[in-house]
Each structure stands twice: as structure tokens, then as C-alpha cells.
Amino acid sequence: MNKLTLLHEGKAKKVWQTDDPDLIIQEFKDDATAFNNKKKGSIADKGVTNNAIASRLFTMLGENGIPTHFVSKLNDRDMLCKKLDILLIEVVTRNVAAGSLVRRYGFAEGTVLEKPIVELYLKNDDLDDPLMNEDHAVALGLGTYEEVAQLKDMAEKINSLLVPWFAERKLRLVDFKLEFGRHKGEILLGDEISPDTCRFWDAESGEKLDKDRFRLDLGGVEDAYSEVKRRVLEQ
């Protein structure tokens, strides 16, 4: 499968048209950003690491009935995917209080939530990806009430699969962001699942093993990503 036209370059990936109009190649970059592109940098081999992690996770989810855009891992940096009409809704699922949940509502960081919280955000960097509810999403023409409910249902099912899967690997899935899109009338999970889009804490030490190490200048970013990759791929 050949890369033809560059369709889009985002903060973490390039998207290429292929010989097949229904398929794209998602190329993972080493660029790192935080706070909606206000902080920029690079993480050595991040693209290689995230492609490996995301490919493994998409495969696992697909085997458990979650429809995804993943087709195959082509090489270290490239993933073959179904071409999606991206829904401009980011779905964040939270199992443990961290990040903006702590800042907005005053939770103590590390508080285990009695029930996972599913949040919707408008995918718009210019507006700093504001939090929204179902009514906002429908009013903005981003989807129907039924589609928004489907996104939340899918996020909850994905969470129910990921939490125990990561727990077996001594990783606590604190929270994570998902993106979805339409492909031939079906809503599929898109984008990636990686330390760029998830908060992972070591289940025993509580050490942060995700992009918070970059966001918060904690150091050891490459080692943290590599450790997640090692645990994801070892079983």
C-alpha cells in the first residue's frame, strides 16, 4: 500500500491517502504537544512506540467486538486504517481523578471514582476543546442524540475491556480520550490509544507513565513510554 497525497498533518500524526479510496495510512510522529499546542517538544521514538501500542490495543478491542478503523500495522511508524469522516467529539472516560477533573471540581488527585465519568469535548483547538453535553453536540450538528449515546456506550464498553487488561499488566488506567468517525454508515473507533491519549499509573508505585511526564516536566518521558510498550506487548 503506497502513500499518495498528504491529507492532514496533526500534532502527533500524518494522514496519507492510499491507492484505495476507503483506506488511509496513519503515520506516527515523534512530536509532542501539550495544553492545546502551547507547549511543544519531541519524544525520541514516540511514533514507533505509540504505533506498536495502538496496534496491539486496536487488535485486542476488535477481537472483543469493538469496531475500529484499524486494518494492520504496516511498519514501525505506519498504520493502515479505514478512512473515517471524523466526528468532532472527543470522548473522555475517567476512572480516577486527575488532570482537569481535579482542577474543575476539586477532587483530590488519585480519588477512585465510584463510577466511571464519561465526558464530551468539542474537538476544536481554537476554542481549547471545551467541555460540552449532548445538547451542545446536537445543536452544533456534530451528531444525533442516538449517535452521541452510542459514543458514550462504546466508551463505557471499551473502558470495561481496557481496565482489567491493563490491570493484568500492573497499569492503572486513570483516564483516556477516544475519537470516533463514520465509515460507510458505521461509527468506528479511530485515532489511537497510547500514552499520548491515556493516563497510565504504575499499579504499585503510582508512578506516572504517560504524557503527563512531558506536560509537567517530570523527566523520563521516553523511559515511561517504553515501559508501557514493554508491558502491552509482553503478553
From Swiss-Prot:
InterPro entries according to UniProt: SAICAR_synt/ADE2_N, SAICAR_synt_PurC, SAICAR_synth, SAICAR_synthetase, SAICAR_synthetase_CS
Keyword Chloroplast: no
Origin superkingdom: Bacteria
One GO BP: 'de novo' IMP biosynthetic process
Keyword Ligase attached: yes
Reactions that this protein is recorded to catalyse: 5-amino-1-(5-phospho-D-ribosyl)imidazole-4-carboxylate + L-aspartate + ATP = (2S)-2-[5-amino-1-(5-phospho-beta-D-ribosyl)imidazole-4-carboxamido]succinate + ADP + phosphate + 2 H(+)
Name of the top EC class for this enzyme: ligase
Pathway in which this enzyme or protein is active: Purine metabolism; IMP biosynthesis via de novo pathway; 5-amino-1-(5-phospho-D-ribosyl)imidazole-4-carboxamide from 5-amino-1-(5-phospho-D-ribosyl)imidazole-4-carboxylate: step 1/2
Alphabetical keyword list: ATP-binding, Ligase, Nucleotide-binding, Purine biosynthesis
GO MF annotation, one: ATP binding
EC code: 6.3.2.6
Family per similarity comment: Belongs to the SAICAR synthetase family.
Protein name, UniProt field: Phosphoribosylaminoimidazole-succinocarboxamide synthase
